[in-house]
């Protein structure tokens, strides 16, 4: 294992990034489905 002292583990970054991407896509499609997507 590389020295990760004081650094955020890569898997945590990947997990958080994945959740954010899924969340943004979900909000985008929900907004478009609700007719609010055009306001974005």
Swiss-Prot record:
Topology in the lipid bilayer: Single-pass membrane protein
Lineage top rank: taxon: Eukaryota
Keywords: Chloroplast, Membrane, Photosynthesis, Photosystem II, Plastid, Reaction center, Thylakoid, Transmembrane, Transmembrane helix
SS bond list: none
Membrane-traversing stretches: 8-28
Subcellular location: Plastid, Chloroplast thylakoid membrane
Subunit description: PSII is composed of 1 copy each of membrane proteins PsbA, PsbB, PsbC, PsbD, PsbE, PsbF, PsbH, PsbI, PsbJ, PsbK, PsbL, PsbM, PsbT, PsbX, PsbY, PsbZ, Psb30/Ycf12, at least 3 peripheral proteins of the oxygen-evolving complex and a large number of cofactors. It forms dimeric complexes.
Matches recorded under PANTHER family: PHOTOSYSTEM II REACTION CENTER PROTEIN J
Protein name: Photosystem II reaction center protein J
Origin species: Oenothera elata subsp. hookeri (Hooker's evening primrose)
Gene name tied to this protein: psbJ
